[in-house]
Amino acid sequence: MNSFGKRLIMTTFGESHGKAIGCVLDGVPAGLDIDETFIQNELDRRRPGKSKFATARKELDEVQILSGVFEGRSTGTPIAMVIFNKDQKSRDYSNIKDIFRPGHADFTYWHKYGIRDYRGGGRSSARETAARVAAGAVAKLLLKEFGIEVEAGVCEVAGIEAKEFDFDYAKTSEIFALDPYVETLQKEAILKAKEAHDSVGGAVLVRATNLPVGLGEPIYYKLDAVLAEALMSINAAKAVDIGLGREASRLYGSQNNDQITKEGFISNNAGGILGGISNGEDVIAKVWFKPTPSIFQKQRSIDVNGNEVEVELKGRHDPFVAARGSVVAEAMMALVIADMLLLNATSQLSHLKKVYL
C-alpha cells in the first residue's frame, strides 16, 4: 500500500532514480494557512549532501505545490506536491542490476513483483521519505493551530546513549543529537564506521507536546498502535517503544503505573497514551534503526538466477541513517496525530452540535 491514514490520507509516489517523488495529502480542512517556506525548511532539514555524516548525493529537494492551495490557503481538496530528482547516478548501480544486495529489499521485491528497479533501490529507497516530510510539514501546520508541537532527535548511536534530551539542541546538531555532551563520541563512532566502509545503527526519540485528552480510536486504530505502524514504516526502522516500551516489562505494576493527583499524572511511563487514547501528557516514542545496509565491503550474495556471487557496492549512502530518519519520524508522528485530531472531531454528539447548531 502506498497510502496512510483514515481521515487525513497521505499517498506517496516515485522512485529513487525516477523523474520525481511526491505526495498527495487528502483531508486537509479548508482555510489552513499553507506556509510554503516552512514546508521547504522541513525538507531542507532532511535533505542529503549537507555533511560528512550523510550521503553525498546532492538534492535540492525543492518542493512544488500542484493543487489544493489557493492564495496561500488550503481549499479542502487534495494537496499534491512534487519534488524533482536532480542528482541521480544510476551508473553506480549497473554492476548489481541482477544481484541482490544483502540487507536490502532487492530480494523480496524481486520475488514479490518479478521485476525491480535496481537503481538506488527504486521505490524501497529512503529517497521516498522526502515526500513524507512534505506531507508531514502540512500536518505540522495543522497541529500548530491547536498548539501541538512534534520534535525529534537522535538519542543513541552505535550503543552510545544520550543522558540528556535537549530537543532545541538537536535542531542545530549535524546528526540531530539530543545530548551535546556525548555528541562528539557519537560522531566519532559514525566516522570510524565510515572510514572502515561500514555503517552504524542507533535510535531516535520523538515526542508530541500539548495534546488534548481523547485522541485515538479503540480498538483497532489505537493511537499507540497506529504510531508504531507509522514509525515502523520508515526505512531501516526495526523496533518502536512507546513510553518506557520494553523497559516496562521488567518492572512491577507499582513501579510502572502513572499515579494521578488532581494536578495531573506524577510520571509518564505510558508515553502519554492509555488504552490507545492520549491522556494529555507528552506522547513519547523511540524508534530503533538498523545500520545502513549499503556498505562498501565485499559481501556474499546471489543473483536473480540463483548463482552465488561476491558483491561490492558503489554509490553514495548514509553511514548512519537514523540522523535524517529523525526528521521523517517527526513527519510520521505529525501525520498520525493530525489524523487522530480530525477523527476525534466526531467522537461525541456535542462536537457535532457545535458545528451544526
UniProtKB/Swiss-Prot annotation:
Coiled coil: none annotated. The keyword Iron does not apply. One of its GO terms (molecular function) is chorismate synthase activity. It is an enzyme of class 4 (lyase). One of its GO terms (biological process) is amino acid biosynthetic process. Its cofactor is FMNH2. FMN binds at R123, S124, S125, N235, A236, G275, K290, P291, T292, P293, S294, R316. Pfam families: Chorismate_synt. Keywords: Amino-acid biosynthesis, Aromatic amino acid biosynthesis, FAD, Flavoprotein, FMN, Lyase, NADP. It catalyses: 5-O-(1-carboxyvinyl)-3-phosphoshikimate = chorismate + phosphate. NADP(+) binds at R46. GO terms for cellular component: cytosol. This reaction introduces a second double bond into the aromatic ring system. Belongs to the chorismate synthase family. NCBIfam families: aroC, PRK05382.1. This is Chorismate synthase. The gene is aroC.
